[in-house]
Amino acid sequence: MASNYVNILRKPGAFKFSATGLLARMPMSMVSISSLLAIQSEYHSYTLAGQVSAVTLIAFACTAPWLARRVDIYGQRFMIPFIMASCLAMVGEIVSITFHAHPVALLVCAAIAGGTSGSMGALVRARWSNLLQTPDEIHTAFALEAAMDEVAFIVGPILATMLVTNPPLPVTSGLIVAVTAQAVGSLWFLSQRATEPPAKGRTAAQEQAGQ
């Protein structure tokens, strides 16, 4: 199995987009726990912390399908302004926590950050499907990405907790690392044009439906 992974990672551009895709996915396992711990520490309210985490996830769930359809039509670089908006909103959340802004500010920033983040894992898998030729290779690639997801969900929360609960560091340090990983990983990933799947464009049915 290991040799199969090595073989697909040797494909032109494969290792680079897989690695940057992993970095870009780290925030998905760090943001919720980082927000919860930071907000509870500064606002002394698990209720507000839970609300902010819930708003982030709900906003993501509501917009991810729409963003995915637009990526199919216009290509993966369509996500760049949305990723930038998500990062800026996360910075806004960090500033709001630091200066004890009104809870509404936290909720607004959380909604924007979650609603514009999109699914980086889906973009990585789309590149594998475009790059590889055989079903066996694609199956191996998807198995690799599933393992990458597990790495993110194991390492991310541990890293976030260590950062937030380390007294010399600010309580927002978990969010700072998460937004840095999102910005660097996502933009580096999306800048790799050679492995980007071609945009499908609008079909006649989509034009008529106004999608």
Residues of each region from the PLM?
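Transmembrane alpha-helix termini and helix-breaking/packing motifs in multi-pass membrane transporters
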Residues: 155-178
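Helix-loop boundary and gating motifs at the non-cytosolic
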Residues: 2-61, 211
